[in-house]
Regions:
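C-terminal boundary/linker of central alpha/beta nucleotide-binding cores
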Residues: 57-65, 109-184, 191-196
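AAA+ P-loop ATPase catalytic core
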Residues: 43-68
């Protein structure tokens, strides 16, 4: 394993891993992209262009497997983006050759933008920004968004943007969350279905939900991240969430709500 770099935000720390062995990363690509052998030299250039970052390599492989771009097209796009980055700010490259967070973010952003997600998928990504990093049940989230099936979620899992576990818990990779927040700009009006669903749960005072902690963590993220473009609706949401948090003695969320009411 090469070098690692930690990025901190107010929620967590995660590592940007670089594996300098091109063969290991080529094997990783092959696991997701069935034609990797056929385009080996181009695939290896893609791996080099994204600075050997494992998550970027995985996303690139999944993008190629989905047929959204040919290896040659993807390489050209990444090289074009890398050249513009080099011109913009050479100071951001750390002495030992590691790429900075800005460069890494840019690679992931380029891969994200190449997908041209449908309006529905963008809407789902927008709402996924509020989930706790530990994730939540895919079925519960689907119910919150009033989605008829899990199909759209499953499609996003295939892209690599949405992470999942064997227990069908879904979450966003922290870097993808950052990009989704800047691209989709979640607001009270654009996320009204999610807010209405959570509000309905909070109004059922006599009913308990097993996932209450994750519910409150989601509400906490909404408070901190959402664009408050409909103040009356937002305040009503907080006023209805507060007593439900009180039922569970969830003081952290209550304090956060009080600051914003």
């Amino acid at each position: 394993v090469g070098s690692e770099m930690c990025i901190r935000d107010r929620y967590c720390t995660f590592q940007l891993k670089e594996i300098q062995d091109i063969n290991i990363l080529f094997q990783l690509t092959s696991a997701f992209y069935s034609e990797a052998d056929k385009y080996r030299s181009t695939v290896e250039k893609i791996i080099e262009t994204v600075h050997y970052h494992t998550f970027a390599v995985e996303l690139a492989a999944k993008l190629l497997e989905n047929g959204i771009s040919t290896p040659g097209q993807l390489l050209a796009k990444l090289q074009e983006e890398r050249a513009s980055l080099d011109n913009e700010d050479k100071i951001k490259i750390i002495k030992d050759g590691q790429s900075s967070k800005a460069t890494y973010y840019s690679h992931i952003h380029t891969l994200f933008s190449l997908y041209a997600l449908s309006r529905k998928q963008q809407d789902i990504m927008c709402n996924l920004c509020f989930l706790p990093y530990t994730g939540i049940s895919a079925r519960i989230f689907t119910k919150w968004l009033e989605l008829p099936t899990l199909n759209e979620i499953n499609d996003l899992i295939e892209t690599g943007f949405v992470q999942t576990t064997t227990r069908h818990t879904i979450s966003l990779h922290p870097m993808i969350k950052e990009i989704a927040l800047s691209e989709t700009k979640p607001s009270v009006s654009s996320c009204h279905i999610l807010l209405d669903s959570l509000q309905k749960i909070c109004l059922m005072h006599g009913m308990e939900v097993a996932y209450y902690k994750k519910l409150f963590q989601t509400i906490g993220n909404i408070i901190e991240l959402i664009e408050k473009d409909d103040i009356p609706k937002y305040l009503l949401f907080l006023e209805n969430a507060f007593p439900y948090m009180d039922n569970y003695n969830y003081h952290k969320g209550m304090k956060l709500s009080l600051i914003h009411i």
